[in-house]
């Protein structure tokens, strides 16, 4: 599925030699991704309470946007240098909250050999059959182990819910849960029936695209991967099944995207 030519516009973000996440080409020289892919931070040790479970973790502090001369976008195996980084201002206003997690990257050179994604500004995404594409970790749904191969993967799901904060009077998130074919109690929102290639986004998928096929071979981009809302108690019971992933919706950001790159 990921090897379909329609998804050649999904690539990788590199901070020098460090793989940071996924991205989607939306014009000859602009790429959309998740803002957190271009943020550097220092860290300190702290405790985190996740649904009553206490963890020790490296908590990021002193956030800053990566300089453009350290950023590269890899498409079809070729790395392209970044000229300009445009992070959504509401993300920068409170990076710790992580809302409005979207960034535009202007490339130094035009990309002619890859068709950019078609952006969808429609607001009828609920219950849509969708395909997520990115370079995230892979694994088996009922096993804890995952591997980071940095290979393009794709999976299917359904937009189960729309919510979150608002931009231009539109909620900014699309939600999909990871349904099990054998245990409907893992269903959190929407239909309990999984798609044939039902999947959950993972580390590395951030910034990748959520696509909807509107006619045979004609895909449109409706979301950018933000990540999943990890529920530790659910993980203890059903591993990856029952987790919920979030995608930053394209529609609310039409004005911002158009103003900055179109």
What are the residue ranges of the model-derived segments?
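A short, Trp-centered hydrophobic/proline-enriched beta-strand micro-motif
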Residues: 2-16, 130-132
């Amino acid at each position: 599925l990921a090897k379909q030519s329609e998804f050649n516009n999904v690539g990788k973000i590199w901070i020098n030699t460090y793989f940071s996440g996924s991205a989607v080409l939306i014009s000859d020289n602009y790429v959309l991704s998740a803002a957190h892919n271009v943020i550097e931070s220092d860290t300190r040790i702290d405790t985190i309470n996740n649904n009553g479970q206490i963890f020790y973790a490296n908590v990021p502090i002193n956030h800053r946007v990566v300089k453009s001369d350290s950023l590269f976008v890899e498409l079809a195996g070729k790395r392209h240098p970044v000229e300009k980084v445009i992070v959504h201002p509401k993300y920068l206003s409170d990076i710790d909250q992580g809302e409005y997690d979207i960034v535009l990257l202007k490339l130094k050179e035009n990309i002619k050999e890859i068709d950019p994604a078609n952006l969808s500004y429609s607001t009828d995404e609920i219950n849509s059959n969708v395909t997520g594409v990115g370079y995230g970790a892979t694994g088996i749904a009922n096993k804890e182990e995952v591997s980071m191969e940095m290979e393009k993967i794709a999976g299917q799901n359904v937009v189960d819910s729309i919510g979150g904060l608002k931009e231009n009077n539109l909620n900014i998130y699309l939600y999909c849960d990871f349904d099990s074919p054998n245990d409907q109690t893992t269903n959190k929102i929407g239909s309990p029936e999984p798609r044939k290639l039902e999947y959950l986004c993972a580390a590395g998928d951030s910034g990748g695209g959520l696509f909807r096929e509107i006619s045979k071979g004609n895909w449109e981009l409706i979301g950018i991967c933000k990540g999943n809302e990890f529920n530790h108690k659910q993980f203890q019971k059903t591993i990856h099944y029952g987790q919920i992933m979030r995608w930053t919706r394209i529609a609310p950001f039409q004005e911002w995207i158009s103003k900055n790159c179109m």
